[in-house]
Amino acid sequence: MRARTAWTAAQGEPAVTLLLRHGQTPMSVQKRYAGRSDVPLTDAGVAQAAAAAKRLASAGIDAIVASPLKRTVQTAEQVAGVTGLPVVTEDGFRETDFGDWEGLTFAEVRERWPSEMTAWLADPQVAPPGGESFAEVSERVTAALHRVLAGRTGQRILIVSHVTPIKTLVAAALLAPSAALYRMHLDVAALCEIDWYADGPAVLRSFNDTAHLSN
């Protein structure tokens, strides 16, 4: 896939990615930075994943790819249970490594690292102390996407991941800068859909879709 700076009519059949954020975890309830922490789903998170799986059962999915962290694998396994597809893990779809901020709330980080937090919010090249910048996340997520989509034109692939990787893919589809991540909100167990065309253009079909959670 080549980046385009302007829209042109897409040619051929796209590879379709359905992007599913994992269900609720104890750290998402407490609004704590949860990057590499391998926390499981809560009971509510399991129910959310099951609701997403019920919706995706008839979505024509050809493959399921997930971040290797427990919360994403548990979510993906719910979909695997209704589709009969195996779950393949891809390390590139892990959440951001938040370094010294892991497990803390925004307020706690702001109190202890005020200047570092300000710099991080202003520049995607800046990483948390001991962690990973959004620019670095973008590089590995984009590389993972290329690996997953290779040879899959015309297929529908479910990618079960986290807030930052999913927002990164949305920004890439829209040709938006990394700073756009700060302008997006993504709920737990929310779905997004993107068409990726081999000749370059991408089409964002839906974002933060949680209709399955209200049924």
Residue ranges, per PLM feature:
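Short hydrophobic/aromatic-enriched beta-strand-loop microsegments
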Residues: 40, 83-91, 177-185
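Short, solvent-exposed aromatic-acidic interface loops
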Residues: 205-215
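Phosphate-coordination/substrate-recognition cap region in phosphate-metabolizing enzymes
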Residues: 2-12, 51-117
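Loop-to-helix element that buttresses phosphate recognition and phosphoryl-transfer chemistry
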Residues: 24-79, 125-142
